[in-house]
């Protein structure tokens, strides 16, 4: 274990551009957003799916354990405090003796590239290595192409876009979210395409762009 040191930056998660969002400011606004974004067929949408991954998945993320609690895989933001604060799904098979880590005040943590399986609730580790020095890579998502802009920018005002963003973030259990290129973006733990389909049905096509924090190992 490395000697105690204070983190000098926000511990990254390897997810470019994701900004933490609070819950919707008030129930009235959330209710209004729901009324404006009914499912396409007019029926009440079911709860969003929580798919399991069919094979191995990977991510660059902070792993953190507080006192006697289980190790957690922090796929969202990490608070720049000392010790840092974050939360996420439980990670099983983790061995702090097998990796370098920092510790303070009953908390132990580090940033790693992890690989394992995801059953929809728990991440089961198969391999962990040190995080890359610069984990950020340019995204090749076609929805970022200006020629492929989404419908939000032309259909909704700025306040309506923010309202939709808040609702989507809460509805999908987002880890991070923002608006860009005519889409409301939201990062979830894992999506096999079913969460994107749910979002399209509930909010309309070309409005919500779902990104998966856990990526399938190719």
Q: Residues of each region from the PLM?
A:
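OB-fold and OB-like single-stranded nucleic-acid-recognition modules
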Residues: 2-22, 26-218
């Amino acid at each position: 274990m490395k000697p105690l040191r204070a983190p000098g930056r926000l511990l990254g998660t390897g997810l470019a551009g994701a900004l933490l969002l609070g819950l919707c400011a008030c129930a009235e606004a959330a209710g209004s957003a729901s009324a404006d974004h009914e499912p396409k067929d007019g029926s009440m949408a079911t709860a969003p799916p929580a798919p399991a991954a069919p094979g191995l998945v990977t991510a660059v993320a902070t792993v953190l354990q507080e006192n006697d609690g289980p190790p957690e895989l922090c796929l969202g933001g990490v608070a720049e405090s000392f010790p840092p604060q974050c939360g996420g799904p439980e990670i099983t098979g983790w061995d702090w003796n097998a990796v370098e880590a920092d510790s303070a005040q009953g908390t132990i943590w580090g940033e790693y590239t992890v690989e394992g399986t995801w059953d929809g609730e728990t991440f089961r580790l198969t391999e962990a290595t040190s995080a890359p020095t610069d984990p950020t890579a340019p995204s090749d998502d076609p929805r970022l192409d200006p020629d492929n802009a989404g419908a939000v920018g032309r259909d909704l005002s700025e306040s309506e876009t923010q309202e939709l963003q808040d609702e989507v973030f809460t509805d999908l259990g987002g880890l991070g979210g923002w608006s860009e290129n005519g889409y409301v973006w939201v990062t979830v733990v894992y999506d096999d395409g079913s969460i994107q389909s749910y979002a399209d049905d509930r909010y309309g096509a070309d409005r919500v762009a779902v990104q998966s924090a856990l990526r399938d190992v190719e």
